[in-house]
From Swiss-Prot:
Residues spanning the signal sequence: 1-22
Species name: Rattus norvegicus (Rat)
Protein name per the record: Neuferricin
Region (Disordered): 219-247
Biased composition range(s): Basic and acidic residues: 231-241
Entries under SUPFAM superfamilies matching the protein: Cytochrome b5-like heme/steroid binding domain
Role summary: Heme-binding protein which promotes neuronal but not astrocyte differentiation.
Compartment list: Secreted
Gene this protein is translated from: Cyb5d2
Keywords: Neurogenesis, Secreted, Signal
Signal listed as a keyword: yes
Additional remarks: Non-classical progesterone receptors involved in extranuclear signaling are classified in 2 groups: the class II progestin and adipoQ receptor (PAQR) family (also called mPRs) (PAQR5, PAQR6, PAQR7, PAQR8 and PAQR9) and the b5-like heme/steroid-binding protein family (also called MAPRs) (PGRMC1, PGRMC2, NENF and CYB5D2).
Source taxon at top rank: Eukaryota
Gene Ontology MF term list: heme binding
């Protein structure tokens, strides 16, 4: 992946993701008079057992028919606790106890809420949407509650954070690293290190990020303008080497592609 082109791809994906999110929000959280509304007691009948009318589950208040995945959700199956209820929190926490199988998502981080959003995408793609659950996320009129609106805001925040992280990774790809009891540690850069394909190699540096307890090794471009000054014709042709959040590794030549740290 070319350096400038790579960043362009990330930005294009960000725009596309935002557009998809906007469409999803209109469908998932908008008003649709024909949508069936469930109350919790009614949904609880859809556990997939003998005599039950079906096999449904809810996620963030949206109800899905998961009969096609019966082996996963029917009584006795690993995910049977999700059937007949909204257990949104457990999709993130992995707590399948009765205390954990709840719809309360308060206290979850933006990244965890984004994980729920990804699960919602999965159910939209693989199962049939059948209605909305009256309660925490939808009112008796079928419209979103303030809590669902907060979830929407956190999804947007989580997507923005992901996009920022991807841009940062394009600028400062992680180093390759290995350790052995015989040779000690080795850090090095390549055109594919960190899973970021690019037209430059870079040199190892410590990157200090705000809020992080320890720095981590990244590969830093050594030529051309700084990433945040691409249009500056008077740059010093040192790439991002002068970024104030970077530090050289003691004992490693400044422009070495590989750093060795013997035992």
């Amino acid at each position: 992946m070319l350096r400038i082109c790579g960043l362009g791809v990330v930005l294009s994906l960000a725009v596309a993701a935002a557009a998809v999110l906007a469409v999803w929000l209109m469908d998932w959280w908008g008003s649709h008079p024909s949508i069936r509304l469930f109350v919790p007691e009614e949904l609880a009948r859809y556990r997939g057992g003998p005599g039950d009318p079906g096999l449904y589950l809810a996620l963030l208040g949206r109800v899905y028919d998961v009969s096609s995945g019966r082996k996963h959700y029917e009584p006795g199956a690993h995910y049977s606790g999700f059937a007949g209820r909204d257990a949104s929190r457990a999709f993130v926490t992995g707590d399948y106890s009765e205390a954990g199988l709840v719809d309360d998502v308060n206290g979850l981080s933006s990244s965890e809420i984004l994980t729920l959003h990804n699960w919602l995408s999965f159910y939209e793609k693989n199962y049939v949407f059948v209605g909305r659950l009256i309660g925490r996320f939808y009112g008796k009129d079928g419209l979103p509650t303030s809590e669902l609106t907060q979830v929407e805001a956190m999804v947007t925040k989580g997507m923005e954070a992901n996009e920022q992280e991807q841009r940062e990774k394009q600028r400062f790809p992680p180093c390759n690293a290995e350790w052995s009891s015989a040779k000690g540690s080795r850090l090095w850069c390549s055109q594919k290190s960190g899973g970021v394909h690019r037209d430059w190699i870079g040199v190892p540096r410590k990157l200090y990020k705000p809020g992080a307890k320890e720095p981590h090794c990244v590969c830093v471009r050594t030529t051309g303008p700084p990433s945040d000054q691409q249009d500056n014709p008077r740059h010093s042709n040192r790439g991002d080497l002068d970024n104030p959040n970077l530090e050289e590794y003691t004992g490693c030549p400044p422009l070495a592609v590989t750093c060795f740290f013997p035992l």
